[in-house]
């Protein structure tokens, strides 16, 4: 079990303020991290808990330069109050490789919500207890668009909070899997193809903003199936089916009243309209990520269509109900998805988070489309 708040503040770097102790989470805090993630779902028309069973620290798949949580405990009782996650990966910013921090999993237990000072001090802990001089001076984060409370609080310019700078909108598509004929142009890649896939990803992702840098040895670590299209043996397009269920789970915790009432009828019609069913409360989504998308040339839309169709068919053969893919609203491939498949669409708002005097994000003049990998966020 984790020690008392007083013991924790001595053992690891920490900040004590207003009855709480904020510290860098250790292995002793790991059960509390998982409980905070289980107990605090994100609102909207569907409430989802993004869980990390069996190990909260495994969520970056060993791919990050650093991966930490700030955890807050009530000093008097030792109860866990909330958490914030920060990890750092190489990404393309203005065409250059930088060590980009990501902030996420901001959770506060219900008994402690609506206390601005807890959030304020949590951000102070992230700023002062985490980081490396080699990291970018700003971070990337996403806020669910229909989470009105989070959007109002975080983006309101509250004294002591970092600045949230809007940099784009992300769309997450949940697509019902279905069997179909896999196009002759698509094939499953082998391990020997991973260096070429990494080269393609680096070459294409450099043109985007906030796109991750992928190297061959990192691709080898993923539990993924790689689909590629070749032109005279050269890989010109790729997509991965990335199953994260052994490490990360998305669990339905509730629906809005209107959706809950109409859910039985909707689910009865879902197969007819080729839309994903809405799972029962408490059930994990049987999903897989369609990630690492790269298409090139004048045939890019056709390449993407063929890769997506093949991915959905393979996912259905594996008994998975839903495939998830994330694209910036400005990405031209969004229209391919909307035209070709019936989907559930979720909006989130990308923000750069920056503290005064710690570095500032300034976009270059290239008008780059954001392309963070939602499977990592």
Regions found by a protein language model. Give the residues of each.
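Contiguous mid-protein beta-loop-alpha structural module that forms a pocket-lining wall or clamp
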Residues: 110-112, 120-227, 237, 243
